[in-house]
Amino acid sequence: MLEKIFHLKENHTDVKTELMAGVTTFMTMAYILAVNPSILSASGMDANAVLIATSLASFVGTALMALLANYPFALAPGMGLNAYFSYTVVLTMGYSWQLALMAVFVEGIIFIALSLTNVREAIFNAIPMTLKSAVSVGIGLFVAFVGLQNAKLIVNSDSTLVTYQHFKGETFHSIGVGAILALVGVLITAILLVKKVKGGILYGILITWVLGILCELTGIYIPNPDAGMYSVIPTSFISFDFSALGKTFGQVFKTDFSGVGILNFFAVMFSFLFVDLFDTLGTLIGVASKADMLDEEGKLPNIKGALMADSIATCAGAVLGTSTTTTFVESASGVTEGGRTGLTSMTTGVLFLLAVVFSPLFLTIPSFATAPALIIVGFYMMGSALKIEFDDPAEGIPAFLTILAMPTAYSISEGIAIGVISWTLLNVITGKAKEKKISPLMYVLTVLFILKYVLL
């Protein structure tokens, strides 16, 4: 049955590997169950409703990815997009969260149309192989940087933007211990991987979590909610109260457009559209490259199914009551564990569904336990740098700028934009356009990206 659906032998994998990979991906993504409600509740949405909507939207999107594309990619409400939803559209622009959901819903409908007409697939295929490899490396650095932030190893600095965590001080027993445990987690995970222990990333998460529990029981780790450091000891395991979902489900269709100009609405919708489009393409490029799923021409077979799953999930998420649902870069953790088919993503999806019931348990997984996984995944994605033609400056410089932009601009889509603009302009100005056989679509993308920076 599973072999018939997911073609395990054809993809050189087995059930155990796929299940382990799916659990690993879920563990590295589980933080979204806590973070997304926290961010969206700032817009006035009910946090419990958003948690349930997040779980269900993640299940729908990830299950569709498994069935429509047979790829080990998982979906959930995207970070960054949720912050834009709450802090920009609602709190800064003053629109209702219902209108923001409608913008997300319309964006999803447009994406379905673009996926059916091969526009998104054409954009994916138009990006040169060098930039695709650079995107993979850039995402690796981005994911590792997110891991360092989640572990509180890297923190804000007024003078240098970021700095390392100072372990001494009044927050030592919360932030300091958490950061130290994250470092221990990186070491444990690295040792397991060097020893070729199957499921090393997952075991690293679990061992770090257990160490956190022991530290809390002995008073070494003291929860400090004000600093974002919560108890890591589960106090309850299940909850069957789903009534809160009614506070967000279907509210997208009750949007009040009075006082909202059509141009203003489409400006909001386009922002969601742009970021989601290139974040998704970037993630698919990066993770697929890591899994050696791209063919000789740099194309991803059956990409239409993957894009359709992403599009439908965005619409479903808006109806349920959450911001844009998109393909997650944390999928790379499951790929690193050997995940190669939709059985990996189906496993992750089912765990998101179970999370609706077991949310109290999953919400206690600390960020310092999952952060080591993200850091190690970043290391694994560095391998794509070997495919970049650094000896050709016309290829190497745009690739470098792509890699540099993603962690520093904190955006996958910005990295792609800078890479596309620099690659096209550099090759055209130096007379290499014919030699490189630049796709007409690359010219279109370059113009659109430049207009974006000029007008938005």
Positions of PLM-derived features:
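Residue-level signature of catalytic and energy-coupling elements of molecular machines
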Residues: 19, 39, 123, 199, ...
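Loop-to-helix transition at the N-terminal end of transmembrane alpha-helices
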Residues: 44-63
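Membrane-helix interface/capping residues of multi-pass secondary transporters
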Residues: 47-48, 73, 97, 412
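Helix-loop-helix hairpins and the membrane-proximal interhelical loops
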Residues: 1-49, 165-168, 205, 209-303, ...
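Transmembrane alpha-helix interface/packing and boundary motifs in multi-pass membrane proteins
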Residues: 61-74, 190-196, 271-279, 310-320, ...
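Helix-loop-helix junctions within the multi-pass membrane cores of secondary transporters/permeases
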Residues: 2-36, 57, 78-87, 91-139, ...
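Alpha-helical membrane-protein architecture signal
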Residues: 12, 16, 184, 266-270, ...
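Membrane-embedded alpha-helical modules
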Residues: 93-210, 346-456
